[in-house]
Amino acid sequence: MNRLPPVALVFLGGALGAIIRWTLTVWIPALGDPTRVLGAATPLNIIGGIPLGDIALLVVNVLGALLLGLLVGMIPDSAHPRRTFWGTGVLGGFTSFSSLAAAVDATTDSASTILIGGTYGVFTLALGLIAAAMGLRLGRDLNELARLRRAADGADEPQDPHEPHKGGAR
């Protein structure tokens, strides 16, 4: 992975993320009604006026925000190849703001459904921000824990050869 140029990492990761998102947003609604034809809305695949495909998109976007926060917390270097592949690539392809906008637009096609669509959009954004903050906090905590473990093992930073080794955690 370290040998690929960043554009290749983003391309490959984005393709993988988009395929995973598409799979989840197609197959989660099918779980609500296994007999349904793809794209057909039946009473079994609608919850509170929102199609299960849009619920699946909400899950995908919130999960993606959580994972991106976790990744950023664990790998602070934005140019790191793993962060480029997993963050910009996979999670960038996995989450979809444009699909969210289309879902809100489709849900607000009449005056009676504007409240449902608007609530869905605001709820998705709020949950995404909360999930990203939680992921970022968890990622930073995990990164700090790993740093402390390396320090306890004496492998955190190269030691100054002129300074005597004190042993143990610093």
Swiss-Prot record:
Signal peptide: none
Activity-regulation annotation: Na(+) is not transported, but it plays an essential structural role and its presence is essential for fluoride channel function.
Protein name (record): Fluoride-specific ion channel FluC 2
Keyword terms: Cell membrane, Ion channel, Ion transport, Membrane, Metal-binding, Sodium, Transmembrane, Transmembrane helix, Transport
Function description: Fluoride-specific ion channel. Important for reducing fluoride concentration in the cell, thus reducing its toxicity.
Main subcellular localisation: membrane
One example of a Gene Ontology biological process annotation: cellular detoxification of fluoride
Residues annotated to bind Na(+): G92, T95
Positions of transmembrane segments: 8-28, 55-75, 84-104, 114-134
Highest taxon of the lineage: Bacteria
Pfam families: CRCB (PF02537)
Compartment list: Cell membrane
Gene Ontology molecular-function annotations: fluoride channel activity; metal ion binding
Catalytic activity as recorded in UniProt: fluoride(in) = fluoride(out)
Membrane topology category: Multi-pass membrane protein
GO cellular component: plasma membrane
Family: Belongs to the fluoride channel Fluc/FEX (TC 1.A.43) family.
